[in-house]
Amino acid sequence: MSSKQAASPFTCKAEGEEEMTGDLASREMNECKDQIMASHLPLHPLNHNKPHSEELQSLVTTLPADLDWDSMISSQHRMDSESNKLRSLYSFRTSSTSPHKPDEGARERSDLMSSVNFGTPERRKGSLADVVDSLKQKKLEEMTRSEQEDSTCVEKILSKDWKDKMDRLNTSELLGEIKGTPESLAEKERQLSTMITQLISLREQLLAAHDEQKKLAASQIEKQRQQMDLARQQQEQIARQQQQLLQQQHKINILQQQIQVQGHMPPLMIPIFPHDQRTLAAAAAAQQGFLFPPGLSYKPGDNYPMQFIPSTMAAAAASGLSPLQLQQLYAAQLASMQVSPGAKIPTTPQPANAPGTLSPTGMKSEKRGTSPVAQIKDEAAQPLNLSARPKTADPIKSPTSPTQSFFPMSKTSPVSLSNKSGIPSPIRGPSLDILSSLNSPALFGDQDTVMKAIQEARKMREQIQREQLLTPHSIDGKLPINNMGLNNCRSDKMLLDAVTGKICIRSAHTERTHFENLGPQLTGKPNEDGKLGPGVIDLTRPEDVEGGATVVEARVYRDTRGRSSSEPHIKRPMNAFMVWAKDERRKILQAFPDMHNSNISKILGSRWKAMSNQEKQPYYEEQARLSKIHLEKYPNYKYKPRPKRTCIVDGKKLRIGEYKQLMRSRRQEMRQFFTVGQQPQIPISTPTGVVYPGTISMATTTPSPQMTSDCSSTSASPEPSIPVIQSTYGMKLDSGSLGGNDLMNGEDEMEMYDDFEDDPKSDYSSDNEANEAVSAN
């Protein structure tokens, strides 16, 4: 289309040329007009088929040539040139679609020339003019047709919709479409608002998710940091524990070295009185760790009623070490102090403490503060002391205190060893001979002195045995309890600084002197009623003679309180409750034979309280009648009540049952920390077969001789054992040997208790029940 529009200026030029040459060629071409038209008709469609640009260019090139020919040559030449042009034009058109051949062009040219040359010259001129005219007309028609085609193309480009829009395009309509109607504006605002809210919610969701991710990451980082801190703390704690273990091991090594180096210096012996949990653990550890070596045997004369440990161990116990650490410390001490061949433990002799001979009777006339039992009662709450009064006497300051001999003053006094017991007794086996066990150079440094002392002691023992055979009546199978105390540890004793502590050993001369002085009270003659004297252990019974670990309990016979042994026991008159309960108790026992007496008493007490005064009236009348009869029968009767069965522990007043439960719980707690091994008791027999069990006996988990309880009940079940050392203080001597001292230890009358049930019937026991034997629980 652009080519057609560009061809329009050329068409104008052709029209101007046509006007200039029209007059000249009109006359020449009139004659041959028909022929030329006939010959050129087939060319029209070819011209139409050609593009307009090519067609116009060919015409533009031919028109100047025609003008030159008209002016220069004749019409003949003009016709020839025209015919040549036409032939060349035709050949060009045909060559546009097919390759040009020279022979074909020559043939066409000859044919055309023959056709053109046909006729007269006038006719040829006319035909040429006609051809030119026809060409001009065709060109004009083509120009008009091209203009029409241009207009149709524009119309096609501008579609009807576009025309409509262009027609409606004005300022008012444009402004209206831009501004819009109120409804459209409201709709658009609503859409915008919803879109804004959606965007805001989406933004909030994104922010929340981002915050959650941040929090999660922060929490993970915090957890990791905490785990790292925990691991670091655990590592530090492990390092501290290892450091503490190393320090403790170092301390143990130092203590072992001190014990080995300073073994010749007697350590300060501190008694262990378990009053709280820490010292309970220390005492149990002492019981476990500081046991006597198995080579030493002990007899009734062993003056060792309390467990002692070195001051270093007591300081360790008081420093708050854990039970495991104490146990390790004691085990290390024990391992370092084991007696082995070649080891030398020097001895420390003890000088004469006080002149004269001290008898147990004289010791009993002293205050209780001079005996170790007073110190025990002052230091700790014990089960047997239910109404103890504080003692202010210091046993260490007293010249007659047995503990005075535990602290040596000099090392120059002679050493004398003897049998542990003042009672001459043959030895059943070599393992039981303490002199044989002591006859070792590993125990003492000065071997010559030791051997001399041992020989002298053996001679004295043989002499005592001969005297015993001559006077067998001096020992009648009875041993006063007081003879086994600490009171006989006197000036002529020595301190054997053995493996675990101080062992006070009597000399044979002192033991013989004491037995000569105590002849009347060693007879152990039965009383008028056939019972043994008070405070005497009957070792002639079959179950007691077997001795050793088979001795499960010690039979102790107590005398009647507040009267001599010859006075009969006077029962109190029954009160109204007892009159009523006598028959009721019998009924309950018939219905329930296995019911315990304490439960029956509880039932009877509740029933008595529920009774009315009218129901109780006949029983009160019976009480008055019985009281009158009792007063007539015993006009000088005076009731001496027993002390209340209560005890004060840690400032609290407890009944005996509560106290036993407390002690049982403490023992159970102590067993959780320590396991005390069994130390069997070594019996020592006389020629008559009498067995004297050692006064130092360790209580074990199995039934073994334990401390005799002054407040034990016959109906109480055996309690779990506690590591104690059996003390035989608190017993009575025979009234004849005391020389008028009816009480056991002067002012301490109220500290001995008879066992009885809580029910009032115990006040109405018979004479035979007053001296019943009580088993030590």
UniProtKB/Swiss-Prot annotation:
DNA-binding region of this protein: 570-638
A biological-process GO annotation: cartilage condensation
Annotated Gene Ontology cellular component terms: nucleus
Domain of life: Eukaryota
Skewed-composition ranges (Acidic residues): 745-758
Protein location: Nucleus
Residue ranges, compositional bias (Basic and acidic residues): 100-111
UniProt keyword annotation of DNA-binding present: yes
UniProt keyword list: Activator, Developmental protein, Differentiation, DNA-binding, Isopeptide bond, Nucleus, Transcription, Transcription regulation
Disordered as annotated region, ranges: 1-33, 92-127, 342-424, 701-777
GO molecular-function terms, A-Z: DNA binding
CDD domains: HMG-box_EGL13-like
Role: Transcription factor that plays a key role in several developmental processes, including neurogenesis, chondrocytes differentiation and cartilage formation. Specifically binds the 5'-AACAAT-3' DNA motif present in enhancers and super-enhancers and promotes expression of genes important for chondrogenesis. Required for overt chondrogenesis when condensed prechondrocytes differentiate into early stage chondrocytes: sox5 and sox6 cooperatively bind with sox9 on active enhancers and super-enhancers associated with cartilage-specific genes, and thereby potentiate sox9's ability to transactivate.
Protein's UniProt name: Transcription factor Sox-6
Gene: sox6
